[in-house]
Amino acid sequence: MEIKQTRIFKSTYKRLFLKQRKSVDHAIRLIIENPSIGEQKKSDLSEVFVYKFKVDAQLYLLAYTFDPVTLTLIMLGVHENFYRALKRMPYLKK
């Protein structure tokens, strides 16, 4: 499975500490094994899945889309304003 990253995901990932990166890497491995592990969103975000995981006591959300060939990592962040920012992503505009 080919893994693609959006520019926003890359820049957020780059700013993480090592322990946070390891948790994100583990979450990505879980998603690769079972892409439907995340919760599929509804309405205007219907093609997006969000996987929730904890780093220490902080809840992180990882938004992604997938098809049989590609897994696209869209956005990573904490819950605060996550969905608002996700809706504004140019990647999801049609």
Predicted regions and their residues:
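A short, surface-exposed loop/turn module that caps and links secondary-structure elements
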Residues: 29-56
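Conserved short hydrophobic interaction patches
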Residues: 27-30, 79
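Arg/Lys-rich, positively charged N-terminal/basic patches that mediate binding to nucleic acids
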Residues: 1-27
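Enriched for short, Lys/Arg-rich terminal
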Residues: 55-61, 65-94
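Residue-level detector of beta-strand structural context in well-folded domains
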Residues: 1, 49-51, 62
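Alpha-helix boundary recognition
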Residues: 14, 32-33, 87
